[in-house]
């Protein structure tokens, strides 16, 4: 009987790898810390760039945390959680991805120390959760009582772009474009902002200082017929979700043609149908046609004869933008075409950039779409410039729509850490250790900023604490050959409150989830 009880019992498939207990926790924590360490040096206005080369040899040079983590070939499941943290931060508020990843790594590092001190994972989770609540309260108190005018929003956009690759055009110039773009389309009649109304298009072949804001839509399209006009002023526009082609029946049909007259009649019938498309558009006074589907070459010829400029295979997203910019309805049929179905624009023109033609649709009657047309000498420059602009647009929108702004440059994090330590004194038991550890983790963000700026991180942190105690506000300001301690609000370093909130929330959720895992079962 005893021998039967000692026989091993296998419940997992052969080849399954299982790690449990402290070994599982150590593995997960190390993986999370490694990911955070990979992006730590990119934090702040003087953060470094990373060069990422994929298996096909494609090179990406960036200091954008979300892009770095997305391009890294990460397999460890715990490490992938940090990638998800970064992605969530990017999707929700558009910036602060590196902050969220670094904070998650710091929370895991301090959790590792607490586990070494025999704190139970549940106690750590409770402490971190309580500290995150205190942090959110501290953020509430740091919200600036200011009017979100264009000047302040430019500072928000500029803070987001400072330190990112913007070529030879300065962040303040780009920030003006970004704020103007957002303000032009921010609210429609229902008070809802459509992010797709601010579009970004890039082209190499010129200095980044040639970047411009187009009040309308720019399409990577050329006319369907070379005889069409290259520009149209005061244009009436039709946006079509249909084929301008011979209609096909829903069932397969065969025609038995036995004579030349029958063949000629069939061809004439097709031509009549195709010519009818062009006639319907011309009779309605249409000057420009944007079609999401195909346009038969014969229809293109008829449209050219009528002096109508036309584009085919327009993306659905472009069609939506065109409809919002021009006031046109997206039509699935030309029957009963009415003037109210059409849109208006000041001008549609074709411009050449190297071997490419782009269509500029400017001055739409509805004025609900703008395009930031970015230029740069190389693909690497315009790609990084595009990422910087996208983030800047998102943070400006976040500042307007999601609770205002707070001081940047690590000042808010210093205030958060101070508040957590103050309230930790009133927490009983070992949970207090976890709450205090959370404060240390948050404080690692301004410490990292100082280090990346060229300051001594320990001295900078001591000075920050001292200035905060005496003046109530202090941050790491990049200036000269290194940095200095200063008032971030006075110097225009401002962040959306939503960026701070989301970083605290997502980092806490990821760290506590990883700490609670004590068993990893990996199938072969």
Swiss-Prot record:
Superkingdom assignment: Archaea
A GO molecular function held by the record: unfolded protein binding
> What is its induction?
By heat shock (at protein level).
Sorted alphabetically, the keyword list is: ATP-binding, Chaperone, Nucleotide-binding, Stress response
Q: Which InterPro entries match?
A: Chaperone_TCP-1 (IPR017998), Chaperonin_TCP-1_CS (IPR002194), Cpn60/GroEL/TCP-1 (IPR002423), GroEL-like_apical_dom_sf (IPR027409), GROEL-like_equatorial_sf (IPR027413), TCP-1-like_intermed_sf (IPR027410), TCP-1_chaperonin (IPR053374), thermosome_alpha (IPR054827)
Disulphide bonds in the chain: none
Q: Miscellaneous notes for this chain?
A: Cannot be stably overexpressed.
Q: How does it assemble?
A: The thermosome or CCT complex is a oligomeric complex of two octameric double-ring structures; the complex is probably a heterooligomer of CCT1, CCT2 and CCT3 with yet unknown stoichiometry.
Q: Which family is this protein grouped under?
A: Belongs to the TCP-1 chaperonin family.
Entry function: Molecular chaperone that assists in the folding or refolding of nascent or denatured proteins along with ATP hydrolysis. ATPase activity is highest in thermosome assemblies containing CCT1:CCT2, followed by assemblies containing CCT1:CCT2:CCT3. Not required for thermosome ATPase activity. Not required for growth.
Protein name stated in the entry: Thermosome subunit 3
Q: Which organism is it from?
A: Haloferax volcanii (strain ATCC 29605 / DSM 3757 / JCM 8879 / NBRC 14742 / NCIMB 2012 / VKM B-1768 / DS2)
The gene for this chain is cct3
């Amino acid at each position: 009987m005893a021998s039967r009880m000692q026989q091993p019992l296998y419940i997992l498939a052969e080849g399954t790898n299982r790690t449990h207990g402290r070994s599982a926790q150590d593995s997960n924590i190390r993986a999370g810390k490694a990911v955070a360490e990979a992006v730590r040096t990119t934090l702040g206005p003087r953060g470094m760039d990373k060069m990422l080369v994929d298996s096909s040899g494609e090179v990406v040079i960036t200091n954008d945390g979300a892009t770095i983590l997305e391009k890294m070939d990460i397999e460890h499941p715990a490490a992938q959680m940090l990638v998800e943290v970064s992605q969530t931060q990017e999707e929700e508020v558009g910036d602060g991805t590196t902050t969220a990843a670094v904070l998650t790594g710091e929370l895991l590092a301090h959790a590792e120390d607490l586990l070494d001190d025999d704190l139970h994972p549940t106690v750590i989770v409770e402490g971190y959760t309580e500290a995150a609540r205190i942090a959110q309260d501290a953020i509430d108190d740091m919200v600036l009582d200011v009017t979100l005018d264009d000047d302040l929003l430019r500072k928000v956009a500029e803070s987001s772009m400072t330190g990112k690759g913007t070529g030879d055009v300065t962040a303040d110039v780009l920030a003006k474009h970004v704020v103007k773009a957002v303000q032009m389309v921010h609210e429609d009649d229902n008070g809802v902002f459509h992010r797709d109304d601010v579009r970004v298009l890039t082209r190499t072949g010129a200095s980044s200082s040639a970047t411009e804001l187009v009040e309308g839509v720019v399409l990577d399209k050329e006319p369907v017929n070379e005889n069409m006009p290259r520009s149209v002023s005061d244009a009436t526009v039709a946006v079509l979700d249909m084929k301008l082609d011979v209609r096909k029946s829903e069932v397969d049909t065969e025609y038995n043609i036995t004579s030349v007259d029958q063949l000629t009649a069939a061809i004439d019938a097709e031509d009549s149908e195709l010519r009818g498309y062009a006639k319907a558009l011309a009779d309605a006074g249409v000057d420009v046609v944007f079609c999401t589907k195909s346009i038969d070459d014969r229809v293109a010829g008829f449209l050219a004869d009528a002096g109508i400029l036309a584009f085919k295979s327009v993306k659905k997203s472009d069609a939506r933008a065109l409809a919002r910019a021009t006031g046109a309805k997206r039509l699935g049929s030309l029957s009963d075409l009415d003037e109210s179905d059409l849109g208006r624009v000041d001008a549609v023109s074709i411009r050449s950039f190297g071997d490419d033609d782009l269509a500029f649709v400017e001055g739409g009657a509805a004025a609900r779409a703008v395009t930031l047309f970015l230029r740069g000498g190389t693909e690497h420059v315009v790609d990084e410039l595009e990422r910087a602009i996208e983030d800047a647009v998102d943070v400006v929108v976040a500042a307007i729509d999601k609770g205002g702004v707070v001081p940047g440059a690590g000042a808010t994090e210093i205030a958060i850490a101070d508040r957590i330590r103050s309230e930790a004194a009133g927490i009983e038991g070992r949970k207090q250790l976890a709450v205090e550890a959370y404060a240390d983790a948050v404080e690692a963000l301004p410490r990292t900023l100082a280090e990346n700026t060229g300051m001594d991180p320990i001295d900078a942190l001591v000075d920050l604490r001292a200035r905060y105690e005496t003046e109530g506000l202090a941050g790491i300001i990049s200036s000269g050959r290194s940095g200095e301690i200063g008032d971030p609000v006075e110097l225009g370093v401002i962040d959306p409150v939503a960026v701070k909130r989301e970083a605290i929330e997502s980092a806490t959720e990821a760290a506590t989830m990883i700490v609670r895992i004590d068993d990893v079962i990996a199938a072969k």
